[in-house]
Amino acid sequence: MSENSPDLYRETNVFERGNWLVKGDKVKADVPKLFSPIQKDGAKNRMDLALWLTNKKHPLTARTMVNRLWEQIFGNGIVETLEDFGTQGVSPTHKELLDWLAWQFMNDDNWSIKKMIKTIVMSATYRQQSTVNDELLKKDPYNKFYARGPRVRLSAEQVRDQALCISGLISDKMYGPGVMPFQPKGIWNSPYSGEQWKQSNGEDQYRRGVYIYWKRTAAYPSMTTFDGTSREVCTARRIRTNTPLQALVTLNDSAYIEMARYFAYRLQKEASINVDAQIRKGYELATGHVIDNRDLAILSGLYKNALEKFNRDKDKACEMIGVNDEHNNPETAAMVVVCNAILNLDEVVTKL
């Protein structure tokens, strides 16, 4: 991509009252006058703007960027108000740290986001345990001074993508038009449009959340429940909420039941026929650490209770698996219940 030569630049005018037929004063590309000017004579282009933004004499760009990276990792930025970095926003909790990270980002890291993330996640601050005791809770109730590691619920896209990955369903396909995974009928019903949600076929319905087709007036429901934005307006900062509806989505949404089902198929294929071995494997895949005896006993008990119910009522197993599915049996249906519980664990939907 390159800029047009100066002789190809077009004239730009202010449209009086927004009417493109009534041209007002001529305008030229430049930055707002309240900022320091771009030090260049003549016409200014995108390269000039990029160089101006990354000028080390005013590290606002670097400070804003590292603050957003910090928020993604720790749950809150050093300046909590990501959307307002000025005098009307909240003051930084660690001014010197913010300055040092910005300097590191501009100089040693040469604006590399990957290097900056590595610096943060390899720090002793990030690598702390997120468990809290009464003493720490009293001294630092909101963890503003990082008395413990971060504990942050995953974003809407991350919750879905992680469940797809754990179940083995996720598609690595990249690019292309938006996809339409399963969602309840009637979401798109509107009096002014005959458009319908047409569920994608094959691997397209298991692609990452960033590829989901988004209609501003009828957003993908499970995403909005987990604070995904409607995109009707620009959102500079997402506020995380915790509501009972979120648990109802991951427990009962048809898409998440399907993920739990394929998770169970994966465990039966990759682990031994021993149920406890399958549960151990599933827990480790989902959480990244080995299950303890207490949690194993709880999940084993859940499996036994579900198996008893499905043995008494085979139709319930059919509802869980599907009548024409080769895995249609009480044992697999019971494992689906366990897998659904694992995908809903706090350790899975929360970054600890």
State where each predicted segment sits.
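Primarily short, surface-exposed interaction patches in extracytoplasmic proteins
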Residues: 1-201, 232-238, 251-319, 329-330, ...
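A structural supersecondary motif
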Residues: 213-216, 224-234
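Short, surface-exposed polybasic-aromatic patches that bind anionic ligands, especially phosphate groups
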Residues: 338
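Short, low-complexity, Pro/Ser/Thr/Gly-rich segments in the mature regions of secreted, periplasmic
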Residues: 341-351
